[in-house]
Amino acid sequence: MDFITFCRAHGIVIASMPQIGVWKRYPTVDHPRKRNGAIKYMGTHAFVQNHALETTVSVWKSDDAQVDFAMVRRAAADAERRLKDRQEDAAQRAKAIVDRCAHGKHDYLVSKGFPNDHGLVWYRKEVELLVIPMWIGNRMMGVQLIQPDGEKRFLAGQRTAGATYTFRAGGIDVLCEGYATGLSVRAALKALRKPANVHVCFSAGNMV
């Protein structure tokens, strides 16, 4: 498989060959407005990761070249260490943000039809951001930040693959993509008197 096809198979939007020897960030199919794709092209081989969907680095190698596999393993291990360091830093920043939040109403919730619902609100630079903690197991690994107009973003470097936020009420488990969708599903199930744990997955890839 050629390099461009390999990258596209991982959901990375790329049209031309990148610079050799440096990490470059690219948009992804699932989040085209963000740069969740990471590539380091080395000529005979490359390291590729879609941070929104993958937790490990994938290695591409040219079909026509002799590859120093020991060097590839060392480089992959180094990339994995740096990735985990960035994820740990993001997790710590997420905790600091949540610690600064207050419970309150938010314009985004109002716009989605939930004027009486409260959430975590972070008052930052005269902007009220709705903060959604993102959990993997029992640990918060990041947050989704939602502006009053609905614009959303994650923290740089945070792990999003496998992360969820759950409205817990017991009963069945229901998956959905977005936070507002989760609120709607929760309200509908409550009206039907069907208890459920509604898991907000943040991306379609996390629902697979």
Kindly give the residue locations of the regions a language model identified.
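Mobile, glycine-rich extracellular loop/lid and propeptide segments
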Residues: 112
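A short acidic, glycine/proline-enriched capping/turn motif at secondary-structure boundaries
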Residues: 55-57, 115-116, 139
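Short amphipathic beta-strand and strand-loop transition segments with alternating hydrophobic
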Residues: 36-40, 118-124
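Non-catalytic accessory segments of DNA primases and related replication-initiation nucleases
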Residues: 1-107
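Phosphate-handling catalytic cores of nucleic-acid transaction enzymes
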Residues: 105-108, 116-122, 141
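Catalytic cores of nucleic-acid editing and processing enzymes
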Residues: 93-96, 121, 145
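Phosphate-handling DNA/RNA-contact segment within nucleic-acid enzymes
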Residues: 125-208
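Residue-level "edge-of-site" marker
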Residues: 20, 122, 204
